[in-house]
Amino acid sequence: MKKFIILGYGNPDRGDDGVAYYILNRLVQELCRSETALTEFQESGIYEINQDVDIWYNLQLIPEVSQDLANYENAIFLDAHTAEIPEEMLVTEISPHYQNSPFTHHLTPASCLDLADQLYEHSPFSTLITIRGYQFDFSRELSDQTRKLAEQALTTIMEMINRTN
């Protein structure tokens, strides 16, 4: 069983909603010690960074990721949030729990974990990291505020990975 999967979701074409995509690219650079960036092919599905860490990216969480989650000891979910959450960066432990959604295409991290637990009898220890977004226009650029928060999130993730090694 691998140690970590880091799951990012959000729309990189909508400004700060792409913060997870930015962080995953930075993780590849940090952990691979190169300027390698995710390619279009690698943007869907699981990408192996090293023997302990994989990353996954999509526009939204999908039920199929539950099968993958069952193969890891730890999971970190990355997403953007709006001003409805007061913290600029929220880091919180999440547990398997089905959460009903008014949208048929929307799953929460807790619901994905619950599916993994119910179907595959294992869900990883999981953390949700959400980063405050300030602009969500059509753009592939992060706002300065969100970029700074993304770098803080990257430091937090690296510390979590290093603690388990």
Regions found by a protein language model. Give the residues of each.
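Glycine-rich phosphate/diphosphate-binding loops and the adjacent beta-loop-alpha structural elements
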Residues: D137
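Hydrophobic "lid"/C-terminal helical patch
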Residues: I157
